[in-house]
């Protein structure tokens, strides 16, 4: 994999330093200082955070995202705030959730997990058990840039985020094709058309096996469920009887699709990097991306061909916002709040959508709320660099639907294993 270009990251990180100014307070290890429980006194938060090392637990399955986090946020946190960023890569967010629960069960105070990249069922699990710090997210200085009235932001898989989660970025399920070998005119625009396409091109399509750590595969299957049942809105709240009514049609659709898949559906990619490799090696014709900016970051990183482009079905393209949350027993909650606020800084939001920087997910802030001319310039410049690999934002918006309620996640994943893999 080729290295990620760092010039743009460095410029935007420097802009964040210049815009916000620097502090000269001396650092310590933060071990004897009590962290504030909220962000209402930001000067107090900054003072408590200086000298702390924040343990940020996040999914580590993307090398480009890992590098973006280290190279973009790490230097700013160190140079401006005196905070050491310790990125803790995990295979699945549930690993961090289980650690927080284990710390609670063991009676541990000052837990090792300071910040988690989280959403969906993992958020609901910690929220329901009272294991998340509350009352801080909407008091962050940059929280004013977030449209909290938008249900896509204020509700995480149908669950009210309150002030327990702060948004980081947005994502939307899209397919990626190579325009050098597939024409736009022949692309399927629905799950029904996809089935026809796959069986007309046997072995040229597959999808990620749904399951923990493979949310992209789960999302693909849920999109099929939405189409078969007549839409996404009815799945926003949990209804077991509706699942019982429509899940047989879902398994029938996927079972009929199976013999047309790569390797006759006898095996499935386990994660997106494996799917990308099959696509890059011309074994299949479609991969996927969650990035609102399309496959630009994958192209820049040499993961997929330079002629790759994103496309979506006409509807049922599931999208959401992803967040960071602080466990209630976090030892370095102040530093975690500073990280969360930095993620919402317009210069950082601009950096994350530029394909060459390797992250490529969409905004968590409402750009119209940014009034500072220099910050607006950074956002405008970033938007102008998306390139033609990205889907037109208007098309993305028209295809967008929200995700299903949390309980459906396990039903889809468990049901898929039982129905498609015989319970393996």
Region spans (language model):
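Bacterial signal peptide processing site
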Residues: 23-26
């Amino acid at each position: 994999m080729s290295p990620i270009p760092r010039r743009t990251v460095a410029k935007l990180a420097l802009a964040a330093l210049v815009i916000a100014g620097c502090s000269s307070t001396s650092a310590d290890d933060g071990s004897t200082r009590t962290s504030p429980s909220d962000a209402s006194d930001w000067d107090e938060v900054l003072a408590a955070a200086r000298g702390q090392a924040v343990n940020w637990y996040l999914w580590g399955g993307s090398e480009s995202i890992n590098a973006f986090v280290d190279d973009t946020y790490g230097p700013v946190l160190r140079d401006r705030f005196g905070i050491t960023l310790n990125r803790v890569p995990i295979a699945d967010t549930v690993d961090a959730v289980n650690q927080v629960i284990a710390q609670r069960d063991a009676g541990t105070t000052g837990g090792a997990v300071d910040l988690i990249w989280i959403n969906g069922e993992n958020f609901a699990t910690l929220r329901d058990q009272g294991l998340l710090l509350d009352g801080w997210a909407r008091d962050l200085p940059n929280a004013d840039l977030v449209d909290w009235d938008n249900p896509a932001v204020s509700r995480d898989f149908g669950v009210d985020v309150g002030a327990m989660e702060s948004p980081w970025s947005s994502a939307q399920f899209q397919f990626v094709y190579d325009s050098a070998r597939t024409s736009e005119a022949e692309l399927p625009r629905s799950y029904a058309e996809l089935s026809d396409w796959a069986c007309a091109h046997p072995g040229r399509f597959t999808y990620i096996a749904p399951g923990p750590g493979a949310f992209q595969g789960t999302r693909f299957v849920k999109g099929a469920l939405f189409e078969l049942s007549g839409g996404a809105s009815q799945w926003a709240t949990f209804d077991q009887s509706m699942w019982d009514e429509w899940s047989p049609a879902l398994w029938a659709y996927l079972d009929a699709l199976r013999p047309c898949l790569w390797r006759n559906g006898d095996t499935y990619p386990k994660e997106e990097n494996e799917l990308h490799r099959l696509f890059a090696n011309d074994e299949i014709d479609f991969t996927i991306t969650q990035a609102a900016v399309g496959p630009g970051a994958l192209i820049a990183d040499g993961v997929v061909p330079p002629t790759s482009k994103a496309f979506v079905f006409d509807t049922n393209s599931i999208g959401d916002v992803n967040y960071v949350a602080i466990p209630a027993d976090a030892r370095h909650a102040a530093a975690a709040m500073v990280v969360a606020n930095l993620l919402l800084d317009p210069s950082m939001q601009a950096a994350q959508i530029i394909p060459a920087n390797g992250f490529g997910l969409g905004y968590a802030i409402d750009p119209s709320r940014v009034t500072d001319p220099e910050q607006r310039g950074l956002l405008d410049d970033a938007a102008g660099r998306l390139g033609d690999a990205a889907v037109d934002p208007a098309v993305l918006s028209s295809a967008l639907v929200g995700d299903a309620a949390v309980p459906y996640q396990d039903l889809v994943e468990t049901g898929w294993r039982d129905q498609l893999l015989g319970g393996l």
